[in-house]
Amino acid sequence: MNCFSCFYFHEKKKVPRDSDNSYRRNGEVTGRDNNKTHPENPKTVNEQNKNNDEDKEVTNNIAAQTFSFRELATATKNFRQECLIGEGGFGRVYKGKLEKTGMIVAVKQLDRNGLQGNKEFIVEVLMLSLLHHKHLVNLIGYCADGDQRLLVYEYMSRGSLEDHLLDLTPDQIPLDWDTRIRIALGAAMGLEYLHDKANPPVIYRDLKAANILLDGEFNAKLSDFGLAKLGPVGDKQHVSSRVMGTYGYCAPEYQRTGQLTTKSDVYSFGVVLLELITGRRVIDTTRPKDEQNLVTWAQPVFKEPSRFPELADPSLEGVFPEKALNQAVAVAAMCLQEEATVRPLMSDVVTALGFLGTAPDGSISVPHYDDPPQPSDETSVEDSVAAEERERAVAEAMEWGVASRAHSRNPSAS
């Protein structure tokens, strides 16, 4: 059954933009017109009021818990600075405690003139109300009082992956190899659920380190669904969309054409996996010019497997299984293929990563998957060869994982 069929959206007037392309640089969308309203422009105010009424009609049909603005102001001590735990182009995030239940939550207060508008607000509430998975952040509820727009999430005590990988303070301990693979696997499983289990499929469209939240045990959950879109259904191969996302993470074909597929998310995942392997930001202007773009810098290394260890984050200090690192780099390279059709499915990625953890307790588990669909007669020779190469790499990763775990159980056998 289509889980989105019970919601009806009014067609809204599209607001003209200065540019057809929008990106987030350093976590923020660029190229967008904030379209601030002014009292001296009654038409704009009337249109905003009309949109607010339409938004209320949609949100009234959503089953998520509703909060009053007063309740959330109380929970966050009137949005005090001491409760602030994050901010960006969309607004601010506060840590709060719900008075009625005592639950600790994260409250995202959207900037009314910011980068996440009413449409993105509704998309996020809708998506997270209908999609439930252990690797998606849990939406507790929302507030749509007047022109206030707030989202209430479960509180993730470790913050974001960005906090622990790319914004380390001098006293922070770098993530070890197993934790990095655990985080990568969690994010991959979240994407796999969106692509393969949701009906219709959902394209996340904004995967990045800042949107991967971590609980106390460093389990990863995807957050911020304001840019998510329903994927193609039936005979359609893609959906067309105005280019949105974060600079450096967008798939090249989506950037060029605006044509969006689940393989666009696979590319973004490849970027995040490469960040986990290297400890580098995808775009870092503080580095030498030829190293500022992470993917461009890594591409020559992808062609020489003997050089894969060069990509390892120096903060790991060599403490990682070299073959597991090589397989992780191979997975990242496949995800970052220029041609979208030869990138792996997220189910392939989940399988491969599930065998690259080295924890003795086997805490990184791999769920059961159905057999992948067989290629049609119309599949090109190039696609078939690429699929075989992908399957071979996944098989090698699985073989390595089995051997590694067997060795950890019986080291004297080697």
Curated annotation (Swiss-Prot):
Organism: Arabidopsis thaliana
Predominant subcellular localization, coarse grouping: membrane
Protein name listed in UniProt: Probable serine/threonine-protein kinase PBL26
Molecular functions (GO terms): ATP binding; protein serine kinase activity; protein serine/threonine kinase activity
Lineage of the species this protein comes from: Eukaryota, Viridiplantae, Streptophyta, Embryophyta, Tracheophyta
Subcellular location, record wording: Cell membrane
Disulphide-bonded residues: none
Keyword Ligase: no
Gene this protein is translated from: PBL26
Ranges of Basic and acidic residues composition bias in the record: 17-41
UniProt cross-references to SUPFAM superfamilies, sorted A to Z: Protein kinase-like (PK-like) (SSF56112)
Enzyme class, broadest EC rank: transferase
Residues that, per the record, bind ATP: I85, G86, E87, G88, G89, F90, G91, R92, V93, K108
Enzyme Commission number: 2.7.11.1
